[in-house]
Amino acid sequence: MQSDSNPAITIRRLIDGYQVSQAIHVAATLGIADLLAKGSRTADALAADTGTHAPTLYRLLRALASVEILREGNGRTFELAPLGQQLRADTAGSMAGWAAFIGSPGYWQAWGGLLHSVRTGENAFQHVHGADVWSYRASRPEESALFDRAMTALSRQASAALLAACDFGRFRTVVDVGGGTGALLAAVLTAHPGLQGILFDQPHVVAAAGAFMQRAGVSDRARIVGGSFFDEVPEGADAYVLRSVVHDWDDVDGVRILATVRKAMAADGCVLLVERVIAPPNEGRDAKFSDLNMLVAPGGRERTREEFEALLGPAGLRVAAVIDAGAFGVIEAVTR
Ligand SMILES: C[S@@+](CC[C@H](N)C(=O)[O-])C[C@H]1O[C@@H](n2cnc3c(N)ncnc32)[C@H](O)[C@@H]1O
């Protein structure tokens, strides 16, 4: 990324960051990185393949080359730079799904309500759309699929670090609570052939999970259950993973979810919260901006270690360990 020591230029680039975000979103939505996977192409050829206006697509591509996502060669040709490779659908840790989701109109509009959130403490998404994210998506299958694809992308990226940091071999049955379409559970079951798994999420989300588990070759060890974690979750397992779930909720609902899990788990069981942990002042940009994302969209928050302890206590759980898993922490909790 180009840097400049002039603070006026640096702040201007930060202010205009939304333009880069939207440009990446458009390129991801058009599948530009996949079209460049085999090598360089001209802007005209890419426009023909994407059904876009060639001179305008060229303007988008050269802007992306200026921030080192693409590289522009002679004759309006473009190839992927290392950052752009991350936008291919087929790379490990692909961010294509996340980029397609994050700039989509409904989500984008909700971020326009950040000022409202800061003034009132209220959820911007609800303010802008008149519905919470979950009911909004439940009635819009395309947007729901876009979100699930984004979550799958993030889950895949987190899986390797989680498996390296956490010994899943000690468990008999793992329930992935709010596990989306099953990317994380599939990775855990693949790494541990002796393990049984249960994927639990909203019925319309897990509807797509059977085929996913089949493709991953773990369907004989993965049970799929639809429901709401405010009512009940599958009983009797010795590990309950919740990745990026409690950060969607405020403390009242967070305690409700954890209490449901606590009620269901085996006496010797544990809960593994896979979440960003808020760092001390001036550190940890990713968690602190993710916290704003939680404020704006689902209405939740990222938490410090102490805030996780305060959330777990009323649910009858206590922190046994906090394990570093790269961008995330694993907060391992057991019954009191
Ligand atoms: C931020 S996503 C994380 C998904 C997945 N754990 C991951 O890491 O990719 C939160 C998940 O919670 C699920 N969820 C939301 N409300 C739910 C409810 N009441 N009961 C069960 N799952 C719910 C959503 O469908 C979504 O899959």
Please name every model-derived segment.
Residues 77-79, 278, 325-327:
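Conserved beta-strand edge residues that scaffold enzyme active sites
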Residues 69, 193, 317:
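Short phosphate-binding/catalytic loops that engage adenosine nucleotides
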Residues 2, 8-42, 48-49, 54-172:
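Conserved Class I S-adenosyl-L-methionine-dependent methyltransferase catalytic core
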Residues 317-336:
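Core SAM-dependent methyltransferase catalytic element
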Residues 270-315, 319-321:
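C-terminal alpha-helical "lid/dimerization" subdomain adjacent to the S-adenosyl-L-methionine
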Residues 93-283, 329-330, 336:
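Conserved adenosyl
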